[in-house]
Amino acid sequence: ILLTHNHADHTGGVKVLCDRYHPECIDNFSQQLSDGQMLKLADLDLSVKVLLTPGHTLEHVCYLVDDKHLFCGDTLFGMGCGRVFTNDFVAMYDSLSKIKALPESTLCYPAHEYTANNLRFITSVDNNHAYYQDYAKYLVMKLTSVQNSLPTVLTDELRYNLFLRCDDPN
């Protein structure tokens, strides 16, 4: 079990799973993980890289699987990012910058589906609504057909997510 951080909505069922199935649990709050550390998962042929991504919480980590699937917990959401409970906005900015540096084809798997609400927020603060129209149409289609917009592609996040564009003067 790969845990991104120590919030109850992420860890609540872990004890039951561990008691029943006895999996290995990997996290950054009961053990020390390091940025860039490669994990070996028993019985799985996967390459998992640890990315330390503090900001939402101090111990938050993301997991990059096979250099193309990012399990980003509450650091990055579709069209948004997690609340900064640490009050360390520089750490969150650095964590988002680390995600921005990944290949644009990276598939991002946030822990929560907040994309539609985040898009409403973005269009309430960014007057350039036309910029988001195509993505909004795509989002409605995807949410209607499969009821989920995830995973999201980093290309779309780099283009539309205000929190990944905060250094853009426009």
Where do the model's predicted regions map?
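Prokaryotic Sec-type signal peptides and long signal-anchor helices
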Residues: 21-22, 75, 125, 167
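Catalytic core of the metallo-beta-lactamase
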Residues: 31-126
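Residue-level signal for pocket-adjacent positions within structured domains
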Residues: 28, 34, 76-79, 149, ...
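Active-site HxH/HxHxD metal-binding segment of metal-dependent hydrolases
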Residues: 1-49
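Accessory terminal helices/loops
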Residues: 97-107, 116-170
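Intrinsic structural disorder
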Residues: 1-4, 8, 21-23, 106, ...
